[in-house]
Amino acid sequence: MVMTIEALKHLGRVDESRVGRTEPLPLDNRHYVNGHPLCDSFPGLALIQFGLGCFWGAERLFWQLPGVFSTAAGYAGGGVPYPTYREVCSGETGHAEVVLVVYDHTVISFEQLLQTFWESHDPTQGMRQGNDIGTQYRSVIHCTTSEQYAAASASREVYQQQLNTAGYTAITTEILHPAPPFYYAENEHQQYLAKHPNGYCGLGGTGVTCAIRLQV
């Protein structure tokens, strides 16, 4: 079962009176690795949000790909605006840790991004990734276009068949369009593993290749 924010509210996990704020958290609007802006209108570029566990390792995964212009760690899919890391980790906001990926679709295809996403975590684990347990670690794809949504949904069906063959259970990844609001995480979490090369990274895939041919 995919746990939506509505379900979290029903279970009493989101307390809008105690968390969130009306103003964005302070942000150093410069990517620590490539110097590009973290927050911009990004004309001519495409945006997508991926959640695949702890955003420290997930962000590094994507900024290393040719054609990715910028990345940012943040929170999305919850019930309150501008949460903090501490609030998200408490389970009271319903947000997932996600990475905003800004990419040039003439250099890297959405299919390549999807393959990286599926192969780099276990999308069958529900509210956890490995030793990281909590609603914030759930697997999500938040799409900014209907084309992304169609491609992501198709890729999930294809990868589910491949996982079935390998003995895995049902994919729990939630795919949404339109994408919910993205709230930038605190500066200390942006490009964390570039600032702390020996820092924690809990990413781990299933070992099952995602052989999709979507031409997107």
UniProtKB/Swiss-Prot annotation:
The EC designation for this entry is 1.8.4.11
Which Gene3D superfamilies does the entry link to? Peptide methionine sulphoxide reductase MsrA (3.30.1060.10)
Q: Name one Pfam family in it.
A: PMSR
Q: Name one GO molecular function term.
A: peptide-methionine (S)-S-oxide reductase activity
Name the residues that span the membrane.
none
Q: Which UniProt keywords apply?
A: Oxidoreductase
Transcription is among the record's keywords: no
Any GO BP annotation: protein modification process
Keyword Glycoprotein in record: no
May I have one GO cellular component term? cytoplasm
Reactions listed under catalytic activity: L-methionyl-[protein] + [thioredoxin]-disulfide + H2O = L-methionyl-(S)-S-oxide-[protein] + [thioredoxin]-dithiol; [thioredoxin]-disulfide + L-methionine + H2O = L-methionine (S)-S-oxide + [thioredoxin]-dithiol
Q: Where is the active site?
A: 54
- Write down the HAMAP family for this protein, in alphabetical order: MsrA
Q: What does this protein do?
A: Has an important function as a repair enzyme for proteins that have been inactivated by oxidation. Catalyzes the reversible oxidation-reduction of methionine sulfoxide in proteins to methionine.
User: Which PANTHER family does UniProt cross-reference here?
Assistant: MITOCHONDRIAL PEPTIDE METHIONINE SULFOXIDE REDUCTASE (PTHR42799:SF2)
Family classification: Belongs to the MsrA Met sulfoxide reductase family.
According to UniProt, the name of this protein is Peptide methionine sulfoxide reductase MsrA
- Gene name, per UniProt, is msrA
